[in-house]
Amino acid sequence: MRKCLLYSVLTLVFTTCSVNKNNVAEAPATKVEVEQKLAFQNLFDASSKDSISCYRIPAIVTAPNGDVIVAIDERVPSCGDLKWSNDINIVIRRSTDNGITWSNIETVVDFPLGKSASDPSMIVDKITNNIFLFYNYMDLDNEKDVYYLHVVKSSDNGKTWSKPEDITSQIAKPEWKNDFKFITSGRGIQTTSGKLLHCMVNLNNGMHVFGSDDHGKTWYFLDTPIQPADESKIVELADGSLMVNARVNKKGLRYVHTSSSQGKTWETKADSTLIDPGCNASIIRYTSVKEGYKKNRLLFSNAKSEKDRVNMTIKISYDEGKTWSEGKTIYIGSSAYSSMTILKNGNIGLFFEKDNHTQNVFTSFSLEWLTDGKDKLETPKKQ
């Protein structure tokens, strides 16, 4: 057992606590005792397969029918990123019961040796019930420095997927052919108006928002580069404006970019309350007053540390990202990329890289647990 000191917000005194051998954070005592201990399910374990070097880059969404889909890189000859590995596949697992049980690993994208796919991300179209899975592609044998941007689509909640479509020419300029460019892993969004939006990074020219106004039939990008920004996530705010939460390396914090003009112009600020070691993170909308909930809520997950990829933490905002809670630690050890979704039972699902990428774990918890009993999800009454 390892001993630690936990500052009690309610009593303003030091309280001794214990953390179990798996470093799972436990809720402190509050006026409302919330009984839930987190269980970590390692969904992709490279140690069980001799041919796989590692699994990396998690993405998670909830399908239109409520099934949960997790996607990830299956890195075969080495654990190197796309440009340095000639055999990376995109694989998924699915759950029909809020993440209690899972399907076997299913391959979505697997090119011949020498061609690789990496960095999965997904968007769920709640109007058409289609799911779009994006990834970055390279033909390392013939065009070793050229990144292509692909998408596949599922119309049956992730059971089957279409053939890959190359959308590079739609969301990137021709002169960017040899630039280091990629679609950010994790997830994009569908706005209240129905458009699909996502983030694409060109390390030479800045981060660009791309999207579709016709449910994925065609794609476009906004030629208003955002800097500084590496891997980024986008959310729609309650007033219809857009917010991009961005990784920036060697700064020790996140940068936030907002637009009230649908991406024509952007305002940028560094958010000192969102400390970050330079790592991919996740931000999603949990509830919206417009949808009948009593509060607007945003959720943010990352490795909460200025230098090291450790301390996976979830924060909540009630004012559209202007301020954030101190956050609750999910895992204090080695933690890297993360992705979140809202399960059909209203709980929060988290899929993240754990213990130096040796595990890719899923866990879930209620809003009540996350806030130590201070907030509880109330489903809107049907009109």
Regions from the language model: what does each represent?
Residues 6-10:
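Sec-dependent N-terminal signal peptides
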Residues 15-16:
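C-terminal motif of bacterial Sec signal peptides marking the signal peptidase cleavage site
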Residues 1-4:
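Positively charged n-region of N-terminal signal peptides that target proteins for export
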Residues 19:
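Short, conserved catalytic or interaction motifs in soluble domains
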Residues 24-383:
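Asp-box/BNR beta-propeller blade signature and adjacent active/binding-site loops
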